[in-house]
Amino acid sequence: MRTSLTTLLIGLLAASAPAQDPPKQPDPLGPGDHTRTLMMGGLKRTYLVHVPKGYDPKTPTPVVLALHGAAMNGPMMVWFSGLTTKSDAAGFVVVYPSGTGTGPFLTWNAGGFTGKMAEGKADDVAFIGKLLDDLGTVVTVDGKRVYACGMSNGGMMCYRLAAELSDRIAAVAPVAGTIAIEESKPKRPVPVLHIHGSKDGIVPFEMAKGKSPPFMKLKGVEESVQTWVKLNGCDEKPKAEMISKDGDEMKVTRTTYGGGKAGSEVVLVVVEGGGHTWPGREPPVGFIGKSARNVSANDLMWEFFQKHKLK
């Protein structure tokens, strides 16, 4: 009898208890700039989102991840790249994540760091995966058209994402950044657009000849490009063309290795005399070298990205 009464009381209490509300869904994002935060490995991670002016939440929208260079962060990448303007014009969502480090000067765990620079590095591949999951709760993302571009260390991170997150990244466009990981084993062919200045003094074009910075172990530009030509099964004989005009201050060549598996390709754009810069944008400081004014990295990237989506 006592057991029956106890059971009855528990049942009555459960019935009278207020129902638990389901977890609140995040509010969808509208056009404009937004900041999102995530917890990863005990660290608070942030990323900025720019939703373009013409965004329609009923229509799946492409996403471009813009990864900053070393000693930078997401907000710095906004003005460094100028991709927000391109986002509004072309209609894609642009995301500016921040790496990890001390204060505002952050880096990506793209591989390649040696000595103390290699200690305690975050799992940034997992972070980008979680970021995309979170973004999908507030923006109508076209999962077949998620792209990554990046400057310097951010460009190196693009190569790592192509190798280790190829099931979610449709194509990559590293600028002034080469392969920093030992081995690349993508699950699928990933189209690559690599942009580099021939006079880059920070990530030199010919690093394969022993010119890497003392705290990093990197591949050279040609070695990075050829790695992905082979991984994608592209034609060994490329098509080369001049995309600058006669009389331009800097000559810009585009070399395309086409015919890759699943429609993939590898494209190398070289700015003759260009430094460690983002073509089409003024360099913030003089010592990083000259930037091309006659071509736009943002235009080249978007033209390239539009040709490729996950299949």
Task: Name each region found by the language model.
Residues 98-123:
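Cap/lid segment of the alpha/beta-hydrolase catalytic domain
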Residues 116-139, 160:
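Alpha/beta-hydrolase active-site loop
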Residues 194-196, 200:
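Short beta-strand/loop motif that positions the catalytic acidic residue
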